[in-house]
Amino acid sequence: MHCGPPDMVCETKIVATEDHEALPGAKKDALLVAAGAMWPPLPAAPGPAAAPPPAAGPQPHGGTGGAGPPEGRGVCIREFRAAEQEAARRIFYDGILERIPNTAFRGLRQHPRTQLLYALLAALCFAVTRSLLLTCLVPAGLLALRYYYSRKVILAYLECALHTDMADIEQYYMKPPGSCFWVAVLDGNVVGIVAARAHEEDNTVELLRMSVDSRFRGKSIAKALGRRVLEFAMLHNYSAVVLGTTAVKVAAHKLYESLGFRHMGASDHYVLPGMTLSLAERLFFQVRYHRYRLQLREE
């Protein structure tokens, strides 16, 4: 099985359940004003009293990954540290696993041709057997097969991701120029992740691997992570930020739109890393790939 370069099929999840109010005023102007500064602290869940804040250190290479608000008093978005490898992988892994039922069941609503095919199979079963009982069992069997193949493909995708960029985050994202990886820290725990990777050929930055721990959703953490990628792109003079996602939940798409992204189109023929493209897989597993773009400045 071949594993190509990582694609954003997430994010974000896929997994974002944040509040989705739009940025006030002109989005781009507000972002440009804030480009050199930390976004304001986000509200945190009640917790024990925090230790005194650490002393300020030198600015890391990402440009916006410096010291944030003290732990326990807000969410701090900062650059990834090597010791957080397993925590970041866990958040990514758990977020991707949520796609299995979402793709199998919710995702079916995005594919009317597949729904029609399944209805024809049920009708054919009744025409052949004349049994209402067997005909009623057909939808349950089809959904069971969708779950099986969704699980099979998504676990294969996870295997690819965990052995490519997510195998060594520091090497893949922190060392190459134009790339970075951030974590959201709340009360000393890593609760969210996001990555950025530059495409020098068209002077854009791709937002990747956005995911938030399910226990900490609803705190605008995903929005803060997305803003950090926008800051990074502006500070390094990239012209646009792009992302691709196979998210089924409407909440994820509303999140991207609240950050200022425009929906550029969708495709039903996207091949997820790890797919074998067998006939059964094509019949019981489908994803819709959405492309988003936020233009920061004209070239």
UniProtKB/Swiss-Prot annotation:
Q: Where in the cell is it found?
A: Cytoplasm; Microsome membrane; Mitochondrion membrane; Endoplasmic reticulum membrane
| Record key words, sorted | Acyltransferase, Cytoplasm, Endoplasmic reticulum, Membrane, Microsome, Mitochondrion, Transferase, Transmembrane, Transmembrane helix
Q: Name one Pfam family in it.
A: Acetyltransf_1
GO molecular function term, any single one: L-aspartate N-acetyltransferase activity
Give positions of region: Disordered: 44-70
Compositional bias (Pro residues): 44-57
| Enzyme Commission number(s) of this protein | 2.3.1.17
Does rRNA-binding appear among the keywords? Answer: no
Topology in membrane: Single-pass membrane protein
Gene Ontology biological process terms, A to Z: acetate metabolic process; aspartate metabolic process; positive regulation of dopamine uptake involved in synaptic transmission
Q: Which residues cross the membrane?
A: 118-138
An annotated GO cellular component = endoplasmic reticulum membrane
Which transformation does this protein catalyse, written as a reaction?
Answer: L-aspartate + acetyl-CoA = N-acetyl-L-aspartate + CoA + H(+)
**What triggers expression?**
By methamphetamine in brain, via dopamine receptor activation (at protein level).
Q: Where is the composition biased (Gly residues)?
A: 60-70
- Enzyme class at the top of the EC tree: transferase
What does the entry report regarding how activity is regulated?
Aminooxyacetic acid (AOAA) blocks its activity in both cytoplasm and mitochondria.
Q: What tissues is it present in?
A: Expressed in brain, kidney, liver and spleen. In brain, present in neurons but not in astrocytes (at protein level). Expressed in brain, thymus and spleen.
Q: Which residues form the N-acetyltransferase domain?
A: 143-280
Keyword Acyltransferase among record annotations: yes
Of which family is this protein a member? Belongs to the NAT8 family.
- State the protein's purpose: Catalyzes the synthesis of N-acetylaspartate acid (NAA) from L-aspartate and acetyl-CoA. Promotes dopamine uptake by regulating TNF-alpha expression. Attenuates methamphetamine-induced inhibition of dopamine uptake.
The remark listed among the other comments is: Seems to modulate behavioral effects induced by methamphetamine in vivo. 'Shati' is the name of the symbol at Nagoya castle in Japan.
According to UniProt, the name of this protein is N-acetylaspartate synthetase
Species: Mus musculus
Gene name for this UniProt entry? Nat8l
